[in-house]
């Protein structure tokens, strides 16, 4: 298994002495769709900020494609790892969406033709090209999130990290973001998402990491999401499909999406 990310005994203290991460160790497979789960305060956002060097470990290390993040390679790491913040207003600052998405490529000192190519491809990938001259503050939340993703895509990273991308979105907005994430993964990118939405995680993810109190309590494939006891012990609610089918697990199995649920029920009823 080729690894995109390796976290080894990662410990992090905030300046006030609060320990946010406590000996965290896990791996993320290359080209996976990985979810980072945990209740509020579990350490998810703090962990994600280590993946492109915005935070520096107090102890331990983070490896990206086998290379330990350090001061010498941090610029190269940030080309490989793109981070999308939970609140797009923390990321969008230029007068237009076009200028915002162009900011990263411009700092790479690319020529104008290459910058335009990257910006156009990134905005079209999130269906925002027609809104390229619009100011960010004139966008809906879903549009802002897509614009923030475009800003990351313009850097052409191999790993895309998103902190709570589904937060506060309506169902249509969630579907749009999910489609973008699936397309990125189909293109060969490793996609890492923190979320509280375990129903969405069960359907979307193929790799799962669960945090509690700054520690990893579970890591592996999505079968973790069918372990209701584990989830609830760590402050998480089991997915609805797990609750509905857990009493019949031995006979019917637990589906990971509505399509599988329908197939199971048809076999059981007919």
From Swiss-Prot:
Organism domain of life: Bacteria
Keywords: ATP-binding, Cell membrane, Membrane, Nucleotide-binding, Translocase, Transport
A Pfam family it matches: ABC_tran
Enzyme Commission code(s) on record: 7.-.-.-
GO molecular function, one term: ATP hydrolysis activity
Principal place of residence: membrane
Binding-site residues, ATP: 38-45
Class of enzymatic activity (EC top level): translocase
Domain ABC transporter: 5-238
Family matches, as PANTHER family: ENERGY-COUPLING FACTOR TRANSPORTER ATP-BINDING PROTEIN ECFA1 (PTHR43553:SF24), HEAVY METAL TRANSPORTER (PTHR43553)
NCBIfam families: cbiO
Assigned protein family: Belongs to the ABC transporter superfamily. Energy-coupling factor EcfA family.
Annotated function: ATP-binding (A) component of a common energy-coupling factor (ECF) ABC-transporter complex. Unlike classic ABC transporters this ECF transporter provides the energy necessary to transport a number of different substrates.
Subunit structure: Forms a stable energy-coupling factor (ECF) transporter complex composed of 2 membrane-embedded substrate-binding proteins (S component), 2 ATP-binding proteins (A component) and 2 transmembrane proteins (T component).
Name by which UniProt lists this protein: Energy-coupling factor transporter ATP-binding protein EcfA
